[in-house]
């Protein structure tokens, strides 16, 4: 599985994660991505190790699971891509209020 360590795996198909993407047409691509989150601390640690990460670097995250985690899911929405799609803009930079380029990193 080449997914983020915090995504829960499908119990019936462990090679898959319980995740989704909302894809907009017209060449825009992914507008929303989400997943059910893994709550089992040992599964999360194993996933981190499988991805070559040091679990000690994620203690803050592991603590959030260790002390009161509940089953939950989450998602992220790309506002610029959503605006690009709704407004039928040709390029995403036209939807970004303060676009960054290699030559311009400050508004």
Language-model segments: residues:
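A translation/RNA-centric and nucleic-acid-associated enzymatic feature enriched
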Residues: 1-107
